[in-house]
């Protein structure tokens, strides 16, 4: 693994080339995927991703480069390529960078890391969830259950002296089912997701109840009558609906979109952009919640950001 002093030298090389801002993002991520198709385990898939990303900013121009060669020499070469892409001509006087290491509280503590758990234990929870879904009193025509876990270690450093790390662990079980009765069938999927380690499965009732509820809910939808044309309120439930907010508002509020004035929200702070009923909060500090962490991917501590309040940006 690259050393802190080597990271400092890479960042200093960026400044010496005249680059205004440089940020290094190191990642070492392990993933496991175990698919179960119609009660049959399809094998265990393990993946490890290790590398570094380099983000450079010069005025309103920016480039992102990456490599799986996490060495000082490879990163120095990446900096030179980035400077060429930014078409930087003038070099700057050598300036020393002091990297100050900071650590922050992680709102999602882990008890059982995925690497500490045998594949057989992971397979067992898959089969238990499968069995629970099939015993829910619903005619399940087909059922696939997938187990996933991720253990991501990150290190972020930049030319402003930031140096920090985080470890993010998630565990997920995805269920895909088709419930049927004769020619009437309905297919759906849902995720049992926890921002934790394998302790997510300590309470067997929790994930087996999830499995039963998922197929029962699918059967209720299958047997539901058609709705008559009418005007109804739009209600966004907790969970996956957060993706709708992310796509409709999140990207438009990103710094790059604002800087390039390509967002509909440019110069709209303090103005009405939505209904009075809309309040949008981005909170990465909620304990045990998926998406919470100690830091974001720029190395800043997570916080509660009110993006839209009562319709006002």
Residue ranges of predicted features:
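Active-site bordering "gate/hinge" segments
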Residues: 1-304, 309-312
